[in-house]
C-alpha cells in the first residue's frame, strides 16, 4: 500500500505549519498501516515562493559549492554574504545575511537543531567575530535539501531569527544498503587564489530489517589560503585575502522504528575545522604586529574548532495528531593563538601561545500538533523549548589588565570570572486555520523567559488568500527578538582603547568597554506582503518587506563615569532604532516543458539605516539578481548557465570612532556580475560526473583596507567532481 501524504498546499502554510516544529520547520509525514516515515518537504512547488526557498540535492549537484554551503544559499531571494556590521573588519569571513539584518540575526539549523559554534568566538568592539560561521559543518554531498525561511514566520523560532532561518537537512537512512564516494576539486586560474580538494563517503542501510537503520558519513576537505600579496599594498601593509581551511567531519545516525508510527533517532557528530592563516588582523594593520609575528604565521594553523553533538529525537503519529520531542547537546572547543584586546591591536595575534574557549549548549524540545474541525478546519500546535548555554573563555574575559579602578570590575584579570551562562525557556502556540477554501489564517504567540532580562512576548499573524485560480496574496507581521550574547552580557569581558577607538562623541581620554548583564533583548517588528502568480508551470511573485529594529545592542557611547586617571567608562548598551526595507521578486519560466527552464530571483534594498549613526547595518549590494538557465539535454546529461548581478555597495558615510573623524574612506564597489557554466553526466547507473567553470569572464574584486571593498571576489576557476554509488 502506498503511503498517503498529508499535504498543506500553500507554501507559507506549509513552511509555518508543516509539522509545526521549530526543530524542523517544513517537515511532512508519510504513513500507512505498516510504516511511518518523517521526512522534510522538498517540494518543487515551494521553490522561489515569498518567504520560503528550497535548495534540493539536485540543485547542489548542478552548481556545487566550493566548500561552504553559504555559497549556494546566498543565491536565494533576500540573502547575501556580509559581516555583522558595516565596519569592514574580518571582511573575507562573510556569513549568511537575510534581508539585511546581519549574520547574528540568521538562525542556522542542522536537521532542525540550532547550531551555535560561532558564538564561541570573541565578539569585537565593532560587532564582528573572526569566524566562518555555522554553514560549513555539513559537506554539500550529504545534504538532502536546504530550507531558507524569511520574514514574520521566523518569529516562532525564538531568539536569533529576526532575519530568518536556514535549515540544513541531511540525508536519511534507507531500508536498503546504499553508499557513495565523492571527490571534488576546484582549481583557480589565478595562482594567487587558494584551490580546494574534497573527498567524502556515505553508507546507510538496515541493521535489523526496517526496524533499525543507520547512516554514516565522513568528509575531508582542504582549501588553500590566498597568497599573502593578492591585494595591493595600502599604508605599508596588505589587506589579507581569504584564509584557507581544513575540514574533517564524521556523522552517525541510528534510527529505531519502535512501531510503525513511533521513531526514535540517535545522532552523533564530530567535526574539526582548522584555518590556514592568510594574515588577517581585524584592522588590516599587520605592520603593527609585534616582532613581525603575523608575517611569520602565514600558511600555518592559528585557530581550530572542535565541535561535537549528541541528539535524541522522537517522532510519533497518534489517532489525535502528531508529537515530537528531543534532547540535544553541543560542545565547541575553540583553540586559537592569543589575540589583543586593546585598541588597534584588538583581534591581532600577539603571542605564540594557544588558548581555548569552550561553549556548551543543552537543548530540549517538545510539541504536539492537534488537527480538529471547530468552525473551520485547523491544526493547533503547542510546544516548548529549553536552552542553556555556558561559555568559558579565559583568553577574552581575563585578557585586559588595568591599574585603573573600574566599578565592579577588577583590574587584575585573574580576579575576573572567565565564565558566563544564559538560560532561555520558551513556550509557543500556533493555529493554522483554513477559514474558507483558499483562505488560511495563522495566528501565533511565543513567550520566552531569560534568566537575565526576564520575559519576552512574540506574537505573529500570517495570512494567505487565493485571488482566483492564478493569483495569491500573502501577508504577515511578527515581533521577533534576539537575546544578548554571552560576551555582551559578561561582567568579566573588558576591552580598552587608548583613545582613537573611542566613540566620536568623546573628544578626550582613553576608554574602557565593560560587559553589561542588564541588557534588554533586541526587538524587530517584521512585516511583509506579497503577490504570487501561477499558471501552467509559470510562476512569478513580488514581496515587500520592512523590519523596524530597536534596542540593537552596540558598544556604548554614554559615559558611565571616569577612572582616577580620567579614562572613560563605557558598557555595551541598547541603542536606538534602525530600519531595513526592500523588495524581493521571483520568476520561473518553463521554456520547454521538462527540458529547459529559466529561474530568476531578485532583491532590491530600499533602505538599510541605523538611525543613531546614519550608516547601514551592514555592507550589502543595492540589488542582487540571480538567474539560472537549466537544460536537460538528454536523460543522462544536463547543462546550466548561471549569472549573478550585484549592485553597487556603499560603505559607511559617517564616522563612528575618533580616528575616523575627517578621514573615513568612502570608496564604493560598483555593480558587477559573475557568470558560471556547468554540466552533469550520468555516465553509468552508479557513476556521475560533473564539471564547470565559475566566474567565466574572470571578474575579480580585490580587498582594500577601507571603504566598501572589504572582501575578495575570486576569479575564474575550473571545477570537477565524481560520485560513485553502490
Annotated model-derived regions:
Residues 182, 434-438, 544-549, 560-655, ...:
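Gram-negative outer-membrane beta-barrel transporters
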Residues 116-121, 549-550, 555, 645-656, ...:
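C-terminal beta-signal and adjacent terminal beta-strands/loops
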